Amino acid sequence: MKLGAFSISLNVKDINVSKEFYENLGFKVFAGDIENNYLIMKNENNLVGLFQGMFENNIMTFNPGWDTSANKLESFDDVREIQKDLKKKGVKLEQEADEDSSGPGSIVLMDPDGNTILLDQHV
């Protein structure tokens, strides 16, 4: 199962303070819009999303079809195929992608400890 690029999406209290903190660790703004309270910070192949007021808990995010620079991969497992595979294995999904659609789609699941995992396909 190819899940694509991995990032952690953090619920932050003050996006400006968090931006400065991660810049001190060598991260640079890669994407996002601070005026809309979200930034994607990058340090080599490591991605950290900073989100102020958008969700309650931190989220592990995988992007099927993307590499760590948000370039489309030539070969990847579509989120709907991943969804079918997970359902066959008995994994409970909190949110499902429309199986009759194509292109962008997402699914949400929880690990055994209650950590949220988002598979968010943009291509």
Please identify what each model-predicted range represents:
Residues 3, 36, 102-104:
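Loop/turn position at the start of each blade in beta-propeller repeats
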Residues 28-70, 116-121:
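Conserved short beta-strand elements that form part of the metal-binding/catalytic scaffold
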